[in-house]
Amino acid sequence: MFAVIKTGGKQYRVAANDVLTIEKLEVVAGDTVEFTEVLVIGEGADAAIGAPFVKGASVKAEVVEHNRGKKVIAFKKRRRQNSKRSRGHRQHHTVVRITDIVAAK
């Protein structure tokens, strides 16, 4: 069974026991989270498509850890001005393991 969920402004195709790196969630490692914004749920070629979400469907996941992504450098240089600026940024992420996909009843 698979599902397509929406979280953090992105969509992810998930199945049971998948490990995902998603945008940061304000939860403690070891907690359980439930994603109710399920866009598609199905098994094999049989799928239920929501408009926009599938009613009654949810995906449960366990928070594994919080980490940070690779550093992204934003560098600006103005030629012949002896002017340059470098700024770094690391995005915060949450790693989750999908435990259960619950279809609509």
Swiss-Prot record:
Disulfide bonds: none annotated. One of its GO terms (cellular component) is cytoplasm. The keyword GTP-binding does not apply. It comes from the Bacteria. Keywords: Ribonucleoprotein, Ribosomal protein, RNA-binding, rRNA-binding. GO terms for biological process: translation. One of its GO terms (molecular function) is rRNA binding. Transmembrane segments: none annotated. InterPro entries: bL21-like (IPR028909), bL21-like_sf (IPR036164), Ribosomal_bL21 (IPR001787). Belongs to the bacterial ribosomal protein bL21 family. Part of the 50S ribosomal subunit. Contacts protein L20. This protein binds to 23S rRNA in the presence of protein L20. This is Large ribosomal subunit protein bL21.
